[in-house]
Regions:
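Short acidic-glycine-tyrosine-enriched beta hairpin
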Residues: 82-98
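Double-stranded beta-helix
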Residues: 106-136
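Short, charged/polar surface micro-motifs in flexible loops or helix N-caps
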Residues: 51-55, 75, 84, 99, ...
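Short beta-strand His + acidic residue motifs that chelate non-heme Fe in jelly-roll/DSBH
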Residues: 58, 78-79, 95, 102-108
């Protein structure tokens, strides 16, 4: 029996592009942009795999977007406003818009980390501040 079009597995849609930010050699995680692949445009849902030594992004703070992360597997570090906090499977973290709380998730372990990331889909009105990379 064929699966319906609105059912997919994250491994089938993960972007294996090993690039990072333009002009930077740092490699980030691999993301499956689930919402867009399923035709959902009001939600931004992604499954991210962080190999050892990688992070989700530059530390950043959303000015007008909400963001949520749920740890599926592994024990990554939450970097938040310059402090590290160890996370575990089942932990969730939320950032309401406009708080100015800078954050990223880092894999400082020797095994892969898997995250479910939910936010509002990118729109031109959304502004992001990168405190350690203000030129972005």
């Amino acid at each position: 029996m064929t699966r319906p079009d609105n059912v997919l597995h994250w491994k089938d849609v993960t972007d294996l592009d090993d690039s990072g930010y333009p002009g930077d050699d740092e490699r980030l995680g691999f993301t499956a942009k689930l919402s867009s692949k399923l035709g959902l445009f009001r939600l931004g849902i992604g499954h991210e795999v962080l190999p050892p030594g990688r992070r989700t992004s530059y530390p950043h703070a959303e000015l007008s977007e909400e963001e949520f992360v749920f740890v599926l597997e592994g024990t990554p570090d939450l970097w938040q406003d310059g402090h590290l906090h160890r996370l575990a499977p089942g932990d969730s973290v939320g950032w309401p818009s406009g708080t100015g709380v800078a954050h990223t998730i880092i894999n400082n372990t020797d095994t892969d980390v898997r995250l479910l990331i939910v936010g509002e889909p990118s729109r031109r009105r959304f502004k992001v501040h990168y405190p350690l990379h203000p030129e972005r």
